[in-house]
Regions:
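A low-complexity, Ser/Thr/Gly/Pro-enriched, surface-exposed linker/loop concept
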Residues: 87-98, 106-111
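Sec-dependent signal peptide cleavage junction
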Residues: 20-28
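Second-shell loop/turn segments in exported
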Residues: 33-39, 96-104
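Bacterial N-terminal signal peptides that target proteins for export
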Residues: 1-10
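Bacterial N-terminal signal peptides
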Residues: 9-19
């Protein structure tokens, strides 16, 4: 009888350990849903943005890493689309009102961020200490969590498919990955290197590197 009791207790302990481990794994993992905000995702069209969020408070244009962008400001949120493709390429969450998955919000502690999104090394980008997480299926899509310099709590968040450094911009420009077509990186790369393309053929089937079939 004692043998059956011990066996049952052992099985219960194993099951409890598995459930605790599974819950920890589920809590500390980046997910595809982390790369959208209020029904707007990277790659959505400008038309979809206006349909879901309405007209912006402010509309402007800017250039980042040679990429021409249109920016739409909704309160403390700035959404950028590629001027070439018209697709959402950057969602910048500033201010103190945003809320992400599992109630991640302004002022959330670093330990809680790692509990929700998993382990990450701190990096320094654009003057901020931050955590950078890549999309589980699209590594060039990133969630950037900027930390407060004094207490390392969450200050702002950014969902982006833009390059993070000049070197990365050049690498993406020379890539054959068609997912970068919205950014018109090849055109930007040529312009930034001051390459004279005036004598190149104007055929639509011409690409950097040769013709396509």
């Amino acid at each position: 009888m004692q043998r059956y009791f011990r066996f049952g207790a052992l099985m219960m302990l194993c099951l409890l350990s598995f459930l605790i481990f599974a819950d920890g794994e589920a809590a500390g993992k980046i997910k595809a849903e982390d790369f959208s905000y209020q029904n707007i995702s990277l790659g959505d069209s400008e038309e979809a943005l206006r349909a879901r969020w309405g007209e912006p408070d402010v509309q402007n244009e800017q250039v980042i890493w040679g990429i021409h962008l249109k920016t739409f400001t909704y309160g403390d949120i700035v959404v950028s689309t590629s001027a070439t493709g018209g697709k959402v390429v950057d969602i910048n969450l500033i201010g103190e009102k945003y809320h992400l998955r599992k109630d991640v919000h302004y002022g959330a502690t670093s330990s809680y961020l790692l509990k929700v999104y998993g382990k990450a090394e701190r990096q320094f980008l654009d003057g901020h200490t931050c955590y950078v997480f890549s999309h589980p299926d699209h590594v060039r899509e990133r969630l950037i969590l900027n930390l407060d310099a004094e207490n390392s709590a969450l200050a702002s968040a950014r969902i982006t498919m833009l390059p993070l450094t000049d070197e990365e911009a050049d690498e993406m420009a020379l890539s054959d990955d068609e997912s970068f077509v919205e950014l018109d990186l090849k055109h930007s790369f040529i312009a930034s290197k001051e390459i004279d393309v005036s004598d190149l053929p104007k055929n639509d089937n011409v690409k950097l590197g040769g013709y396509v079939k």
